[in-house]
A protein has these predicted regions:
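Short, aromatic/His-centered strand-loop micro-motif at the edge of beta-sheets
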Residues: 352-377
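Short tryptophan-centered beta-strand motifs in secreted/extracellular beta-sheet-rich domains
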Residues: 203, 298, 371-391
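Flexible glycan-contacting loops in extracellular carbohydrate-active proteins
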Residues: 399-425
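Short beta-strand micro-motifs enriched in acidic
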Residues: 45-49, 341-345, 381-383
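Short beta-strand segments enriched in hydrophobic/aromatic residues
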Residues: 46, 121, 300-304, 319, ...
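Phosphate-group recognition and catalysis centered on beta-loop-alpha active-site segments
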Residues: 1-265, 292-294, 385-388
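Secretory/extracellular carbohydrate-interaction modules
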Residues: 273-351
Length: 429
């Protein structure tokens, strides 16, 4: 397959899909390819011995158990680095993963998968092209990238297509014979896309992880989308009615609103450690069969708290789309829906949320306080005219609200505040 064969817009697995897999690892690339993603991205820097290492950052600090500059490593020391996969992703991946050399990527994926390669260090473009030529990789199967116009010129002079990153300068790109521009999402408009297409230039936008944003950009006319969650952005593949927390699988659309959370192998749950703020994660993989009438069932457990029983809570936010919900910030523009809270003292609260701002609708009287380390079954039902929020188990209590202000609200976010909170057995029907 060549880039010319792809229907537009297509999705590029940014860093291999960094929200689902350990970024820029061979293991992560294999998952991306196994998911049917046609394009994987690499960030390539020159090493001290002239080798080429694949890593986004200029240091190894964030991604490995070591520290120091990428450029100070040789090819040998590069392969001795340990990717801190479990800590970075919150579980689900083993230790002992290694950052790849670009040669390894070409041996396994060259001419098999479409590659989108950024020359990350200022001296990387020429050796990247040399490596591609040496391995006999077809130029039709590669898009190079750079923010530097000089590097883009070099790529074009060697016969390779290139994305000029960070620009909307269509006139200059056309004059340089550059076939792609790569602006950030906030700089893309329908006018930019129209000007680019009129000049024979395509638009690759970065980095897009939410479907509401994707839909606007597709309507604007973009040709390619870089995404850290490429399966979620590409379509409905991977959507399901229940979680896979027990298998420690990061499903498509499991995106941090304010935090990522982590898996707990001891009981097959996922959740947040105690924190002096509110944290929340989108569960974009959940998809009800009928968005107009949904029932969400889950088990919630509260662990250590750092506030009183009225302040500490676990919560569910049901929203109209996948705008992030950031309850501890000054607001969450675009976040509309309903907030369901279980407080440490046992109170159930329901709020209507408009542009991220909650307004109380109803509360139960304080019931039996939550017992630390004990799961509580919860059920939320949304009909065309109302909401039911039920706590089961030893305490059977329901809050009923007549409100139809937001419909449908099929998008699930899970969170907690001032407490360690775990969730499991999440089912949306």
């Amino acid at each position: 397959m060549d880039f010319a064969d792809l229907s537009r817009p297509f999705v590029i697995a940014h860093r291999g899909g960094a929200l689902q897999v350990p970024e820029h690892t061979m293991e992560g690339y294999r998952v991306a390819v196994g998911q049917g993603l046609p394009v994987i991205e690499q960030d390539v820097s020159t090493l001290a011995d002239g080798g080429l290492g694949v890593m986004h950052d200029g240091t190894v600090d964030r991604m490995t158990t070591s520290s120091g500059n990428v450029a100070d490593h040789t090819s040998v020391s590069w392969k001795q680095l340990d990717i801190d996969a479990s800590a970075i992703l919150g579980g689900g991946w083993p230790d002992g993963l290694r950052p790849p050399l670009f040669e390894e990527v070409l041996v396994e994926f060259g001419n098999r998968v479409l590659l989108c390669v950024e020359a990350k260090s200022s001296d990387a473009m020429e050796p990247v092209i040399d490596a591609l030529d040496r391995r006999g990789v077809s130029p039709a199967s590669v898009l190079l990238q750079s923010y530097a116009l000089a590097e883009c010129r070099l790529a074009r002079s060697r016969g390779w297509d290139v994305i000029w990153l960070g620009t909307t300068d269509v006139v200059r790109a056309a004059a340089e014979g550059i076939g792609w521009i790569g602006p950030e999402a906030g700089h893309v408009t329908s006018a930019v896309c129209a000007r680019a297409h009129a000049a024979g230039i395509e638009v690759a936008v970065h980095t897009v992880n939410r479907r509401h944003q994707r839909d606007v950009l597709v309507a604007d006319g973009v040709d390619a989308i870089f995404s850290d969650d490429p399966v979620y952005i590409a379509g409905d593949a991977g959507r399901r009615a229940s979680d896979l927390f027990a298998r420690q699988v990061w499903l498509p659309g499991m995106l941090p609103d304010t935090g990522r959370g982590r898996f707990h192998a001891d009981d097959g749950s996922w959740g947040f450690d105690v924190s002096g703020t509110a944290t929340c994660t989108l569960m974009g993989f959940l998809a009800p069969s009928d968005p107009a009438a949904i029932t969400l069932r889950l088990d919630l457990r509260m662990d250590e708290t750092c506030a009183d029983g009225r302040t500490s809570c676990g919560f569910v936010f049901l929203s109209t789309d996948d705008h992030p919900y950031r309850p501890s910030s000054d607001g969450s523009p675009g976040a509309d829906g309903y907030l369901f809270l279980v407080r440490g003292d046992g109170t159930l609260d329901v709020h209507r949320v408009v542009e991220g701002v909650p307004t109380p609708l109803a509360s139960s009287t304080a019931g039996e306080a939550l017992r630390t380390g004990t799961y509580v079954p919860l059920r939320i039902t949304v009909t065309g005219s109302g909401l039911l929020f039920t706590r089961g188990g030893d305490v059977d209590e329901t809050v009923t609200v007549a409100d139809a202000g937001h419909r449908p609200v099929p998008v699930v976010h899970l969170g907690g505040a001032f407490a360690g909170v775990r969730f499991k057995d999440v089912v949306l029907t």
